[in-house]
Curated annotation (Swiss-Prot):
Its cofactor is Zn(2+). Keywords: Hydrolase, Metal-binding, Nucleotide metabolism, Secreted, Signal. It is found in: Secreted. GO terms for biological process: adenosine catabolic process; inosine biosynthetic process; nucleotide metabolic process. The lineage of its organism: Eukaryota, Metazoa, Ecdysozoa, Arthropoda, Hexapoda. InterPro entries: A_deaminase_dom, A_deaminase_N, ADGF, Ado/ade_deaminase, Metal_Hydrolase. GO terms for molecular function: adenosine deaminase activity; metal ion binding. It comes from Aedes albopictus. Induction: Up-regulated in salivary glands by blood feeding (at protein level). This is Adenosine deaminase.
Length: 533
């Protein structure tokens, strides 16, 4: 009986009218195509060679032509580079760019490639910050000056307060000169160097997260400010920082500055205009002393935590500086940790009211997040008309931004060591800049805050980018292209760029002639030693 009912039910269903719009035709299978033959091995090899050649033609530096001396040096340096990379390929733990820089700082000097890069004229640094330009030694030197007072002790994660004053600021303050007497200069210097650095011998355990290291970073600035913003120190620190960049064969600098309150013993607090005037005067004096130095431009870059009311005051300052220093002021940016900070979209209504003659150089995408307000700063930076992008670490997650960067020639300022120290990347071989290097994007390599990582103004960053991020195939043409890019994508006008290229070319040709002689002499000596051993 149950079987009979089931049959009747099914028969009834077949008589139901099904609405025509619910009837879908079965997807047709694709027509089978004749199976082609596989290529022969010789054909495969030809296709492979053509494929790789096409990739090579897209590499950053592929369009650079080397002189005879450069070709000679290139041959030697590529032998050195490939030797280091081959050793790293067989033992990646001992490959410098694969490790945290704090773990291998003492090994850079053992690298032949690094020692050559140190001698290389690297053009300019387009991404650096005012209170992190010079080495920690410059800060230590400042603590020997008279009238410096200290409040509190050196802690594990914080430092004492400092202040220059003719009179004792309060009962809890002590003269640093007196503290040095009972602590000894050697011990005190070591304490200062430790406080004003992010360096830690065990960085992976010392800094568990990006927020941990940013917290130390911000505490460092808070402790440093009253010490370094004393007017005589501020001036000397800037001058000595320029000398350190110059000694690292950096001929040009564009740096961001927050314009903090600079003060003197008479109680004067310098205005924004007076601080920029100080920068300008010191720069001109430095250029007069070192004629092959190209120059400096300043990017006003206050913090991104400002309220709407505070932000308007910052823009008013920007307008005043632009009018008084139309050539020395390169433009405007916002600094500070992006993730907790306000987004560019929030500031856009006010930013769009600035005159078009004020250029933007926005930090954007300094984050590991995707689809959040931080990486979307990249979109806003492009739409706001930024001339360059600071870091752009998340740019690979935004393909349209990548297209616009190429179309508009928006340069990305890559800071590999800073990205590692601030926990964005652990192994430089995984740095997203590898893609930018592989397809000739507009890029420069800079150093961000070299002093806090105990690295050189640019050589350490160039080295890890050259051996760890760039292709094993990328050679001196890559290095030369980066140096040229630092001039091309700078804020200099066309006349200034012409002069800059002349000065850089002279330095480059001179160094390459010396390197060629040294390499040939070294090779002859090596062969002679091999014969007598």
């Amino acid at each position: 009986m149950k079987i009979l009912l089931a049959v009747v039910f099914v028969l009834n269903l077949t008589n139901l009218a099904v609405p025509q719009h619910l009837i879908t035709s079965s997807p047709s299978l694709p027509e089978s195509k004749p199976v082609g033959r596989r290529p022969t091995y010789e054909e495969y090899k030809q296709q492979r060679e053509s494929f790789l050649q096409t990739e090579d033609h897209h590499l950053l530096g592929a369009n650079v032509t080397l002189t005879e001396n450069e070709q000679l040096v290139n041959k030697f340096i590529m032998q050195m580079k490939l030797d280091e990379m081959e050793k790293g390929f067989n033992d990646s733990y001992n490959f410098i760019p694969a490790r945290h820089i704090f773990e291998v700082l003492d090994r850079f000097g053992q690298s032949k490639v690094f020692n050559v890069i140190r001698r290389l004229p690297k053009g300019g640094v387009l991404h650096a910050h005012d209170m992190a330009l010079g080495s920690t030694d410059l800060i230590v030197n400042a603590t020997y000056l008279e009238n410096l007072w200290q409040k509190g002790n050196f802690g594990l994660n914080h430092g004492p307060e400092f202040k220059f004053s003719r009179e004792r600021p309060g009962k809890e303050w002590s003269l640093v000169s007196e503290i040095r007497q009972w602590m000894t200069n050697e011990v005190y210097d070591a304490k200062v160097a430790e406080v004003f650095s992010l360096y830690n011998a065990d960085p992976l355990n010392a800094y568990k997260s990006l927020d941990n290291v940013w917290s130390k970073f911000q505490n460092l600035f808070a402790c440093l400010a009253p010490l370094i913003t004393f007017a005589p120190v501020w001036r000397q620190y800037y001058h000595d920082s320029l000398k350190q960049f110059y000694d690292d064969h950096v001929q040009y600098l564009e740096f961001r500055g927050v314009l903090p309150e600079v003060y003197d013993l008479d109680g004067k607090v310098y205005s924004a205009e007076e601080i920029v005037q100080l920068y300008y005067e010191e720069t001109e004096q430095f250029k007069a002393k070192y004629p092959d130095f190209i120059g400096v431009k300043f990017i006003y870059a206050p913090g991104r935590y400002a309220s709407d009311e505070e932000f308007q005051k910052l823009l008013d300052t920007t307008n005043r500086l632009h009018k008084k220093f139309p050539n020395f002021l390169a433009g405007f940016d916002l600094v500070g940790q992006e993730d907790p900070g306000r987004s560019l979209f929030e500031f856009a209504p006010a930013l769009l009211k600035l005159p078009a003659s004020i250029n933007f150089f926005f930090h954007a995408g300094e984050t590991n997040w995707y689809g959040m307000k931080t990486d979307q700063n990249l979109v806003d930076a492009v739409l706001l008309g930024t001339k360059r992008i600071g870091h752009g670490f998340a740019v690979l997650k935004h393909p349209k931004v990548l297209k616009e960067i190429k179309r508009r020639q928006i340069c990305i300022e890559i800071n590999p060591i800073s990205n590692q120290v601030l926990k964005l990347v652990q192994d430089q071989r995984n740095h997203p800049a590898a893609l930018l290097f592989s397809d000739n994007y507009p890029v420069v390599v800079s150093s961000d805050d070299p002093s806090f990582g105990r690295s050189t103004p640019l050589s350490h960053d160039f080295y890890v980018a050259f051996t760890g991020i760039a292709s094993a195939k990328q050679d001196w043409r890559w290095l030369k292209q980066l140096a040229l890019n630092s001039i091309e994508y700078s804020a200099m006008n066309s006349e200034e760029k012409t002069v800059a290229k002349e000065k850089w070319n002279q330095a480059w040709d001179h160094q390459f002639s010396r390197l060629a002689v040294d390499f040939v002499a070294g090779k002859i000596l090596e062969n002679w030693i091999m014969k007598i051993v």
